[in-house]
Amino acid sequence: MNFFEFKGIKIAGMATAVPDRHQKMSDYDYLFAEGEVEKFCAATGIYEKYNAYGVGTTTSDLCVAAANKLFEKLNINKDTIDGLIMITQTPDYFVPPTSCIVQHRLGLDNCGLVYDSNIGCTAFPFGLQMACANIMAGCKRILLLVGDANPNRGETSNKDGLLFGDAGVAIIVEKTDEDISPINIAIETIGSGYKSLITPYGMERHPLPVVAQTRGFEFAAYYNNATYMSCLLYTS
């Protein structure tokens, strides 16, 4: 585990955007055995969520909306943003990085430091560490974007429909002379457990066209989802 302390840096503000589609967990009752959804809600505390499925809203759409809301709220001059970090596992495209698209859509022409990361559940602490490190290296104000949206993922009976909601969050991290407490972050990565959270097919290790030819596209699509979700829900 690594510990970081950043002095003279603050989180100036945060805004969130969600899709228009609002769902209650009880909407999924018909997909599961009686009592399963109720048990899930009791264990997780999740009773409702926002879902991008069917409305065509992507991660960049949500993050752009959140960022514009934050700029307006804080009355920020966009020319003062000198770094943009976007963390998502649901990018708009394989290439280019979604951060580049967001930079263009937000009109951040003077922002040269722009990049993506695909970290999942720990996106915020890792993203905050990246933002703070870049400020220590010379940036003054970073726009950190964290979000995921699955506009093409339908309802399934393997509990991913219950677990995942969609949202985009914009955070302004900036240098300050204020007398405030430092930002302390502890992060750890356990690479040996990579198979516990994996989508095995679709990239260069197991290209989707090859898998589809040998075992069928439906197998690849199902196994990607089933493997990821079974590990996520049933391993410690």
What does each of the following model-derived ranges do?
Residues 40, 80-87, 113-116, 141-147, ...:
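Beta-strand segments within the central parallel beta-sheet cores of soluble alpha/beta enzyme folds
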Residues 66-81:
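Phosphate/pyrophosphate-binding loops at sites that engage ATP/ADP/AMP, CoA/4′-phosphopantetheine
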Residues 138-169:
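Flexible, glycine-rich active-site loops centered on histidine and acidic residues
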